[in-house]
Amino acid sequence: MTQTVYFGTYTRRDSKGIYKADFNSNKGTLENLTLVAEEPSPTYLAFDKAGHLYSVGAKDGQGGIAAFDQAGQLLNHVVEEGAPLCYVAVDEERNLVYGANYHKGQVLVYKRLADGGLELADSASHQGQGLHTNQASAHVHYADLTPDQYLITCDLGTDEVTTYDVAADGKITPLDTYKCAAGAGARHIVFHHHYKIAYLICELNSTIEVLIYDGVGHFEHLQTISTLPEDFEGANGTAAIRLSADGKFLYGSNRGHDSLAVYKILADGSLELIQIAPTNGQNPRDFNITPDQNHIIAVHQDSDNATIFKRDAESGKLTEISHDFYVPEAVCVTFK
């Protein structure tokens, strides 16, 4: 069986924009890297159910978001002065797209137009700072939906996870804020499919916080666990976090140690570290589990390679198949 994999990239060196490749799930191989669309540093991608592609985008020196049709043709940009976004997500129910702007500390809401294009519906600016040198101001790194359809943001600069109520027209109202460990740097969050549990990966202190979620935007801390070996003393920053479809295993990436941390999810939703798998590349900013759950594809921003792992569905553990497929400056892996 062949699946199409899409890659978001930086375009600082050799990359031209958004790429795709064919993944053969029987062989565990990637083939036929193809440029889908030229776009300046499309570092995060999201598809809607109709097949429109939304990416971090830029135009004429301004930053924002780009919308593409099913064939990869540009529909429009929505941009303003300053740096582009760092995260994009689709809300099918409300016909919206969400964006996070790291440099401006903003969460943005876009209305989807009839042709799949976008227009800005609302935005909110975060304020504050943290203890770490990378926390001089608010840095919103994530904006997506909770299981009960609230908007949730992770702010790396303020160590805060904020939930918003979203009106039908895209207007947002803050509901509640969870404060993670000081200097932790909240980056991304995923929610368990069965338990009222969320997993928050923190970039600056290389941890995952396990949170009890009560369903109305409120969190309580359950556990904090490291993503690193106990004896590691080098520089590291975490990046992506993914949950297996059966809810039994959790994965997080380390940049610096250049590895994937693998956790077993226990009966109360807490985590047990069971493996740290080297990715054999530099700076694994993103990875994803294939739709059939049998493989993981990790990409490396600095070494321009994709690493393919076989995933054991019973144990959750990973075995590397290869690490030599070329993808320039890749920082996002997704499937249509």
Where are these regions (language model features)?
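Blade-loop segments of beta-propeller domains
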Residues: 32-94
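A short beta-strand motif characteristic of beta-propeller blades
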Residues: 31-37, 73-79, 122, 128-133, ...
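Beta-rich, blade/repeat-based domains predominating
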Residues: 39-49, 81-92, 128-148, 180-195, ...
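Loop-centered beta-sheet repeat module
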Residues: 151-206
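Short loop/turn segments immediately following beta-strands, especially the blade-tip
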Residues: 22-28, 70-71, 110-119, 165-171, ...
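Short loop/turn segments immediately following the C-termini of beta-strands
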Residues: 10-12, 58-60, 102-104, 112, ...
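Asp-box/WD-like beta-propeller blade repeats and closely related beta-sheet repeat scaffolds
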Residues: 74-142
